[in-house]
UniProtKB/Swiss-Prot annotation:
Family statement drawn from the similarity comment of this UniProt entry: Belongs to the UPF0180 family.
UniProt cross-references to HAMAP family, sorted A to Z: UPF0180
Species name: Geobacillus kaustophilus (strain HTA426)
Coiled-coil spans in chain: none
Record-annotated membrane-spanning stretches: none
Pfam annotation, one family: UPF0180
Entry protein name: UPF0180 protein GK1051
Length: 80
């Protein structure tokens, strides 16, 4: 199953993805995103200056305003 990086504060999302069989890893830093098929972030760490390092080629989903179920659906859509 796909490896999904999820920010540690999104515990409900982590649990929902685990229930669906995904390999969930906490995103505590840039290194944690390496090798992930998809990442889920809160959006609070968005780089305002637009300068960032690309460490994953997979999709990144911003969780703000979405339920855990909606995020799971987005992950599944992106990984198709």
């Amino acid at each position: 199953m796909a490896k999904i990086g999820v920010e540690p504060s999104l515990t409900d999302v982590q649990e929902a993805l685990k229930e669906r069989g995904y390999d969930v890893v906490p995103l505590r830093g840039e290194q944690d995103a390496r090798g992930c098929d998809c990442c889920v972030i809160t959006g609070l760490d968005a780089n305002i200056a637009g300068i960032h390092n690309i460490v994953t080629s997979g999709p990144v989903i911003e969780a703000s305003g979405l339920t855990a179920e909606e995020i799971c659906q987005k992950v599944e859509e992106k990984l198709r």
